[in-house]
């Protein structure tokens, strides 16, 4: 399963590592390169540096291939906006979304 995780903090890093170990194809998006470097070094996970509320960042992260989006930034507003943007980008294609609020 392809899972897109937005937010590479403590929660996002843990969820990404766990899901990757279970055999899922995981992509993590964060505005900061530092936590993404650690995730890449410790796991077989693709990362994207950028603002996930920007549709071009979601496109770069290949949101159209994701089956699930998990938004776990520190901002509930950002998490909700990312979920809405991702669903909008997918059009009629179903996408399960989980937002930390």
Please name every model-derived segment.
Residues 1-101:
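Cytosolic regulatory regions of ion transport systems
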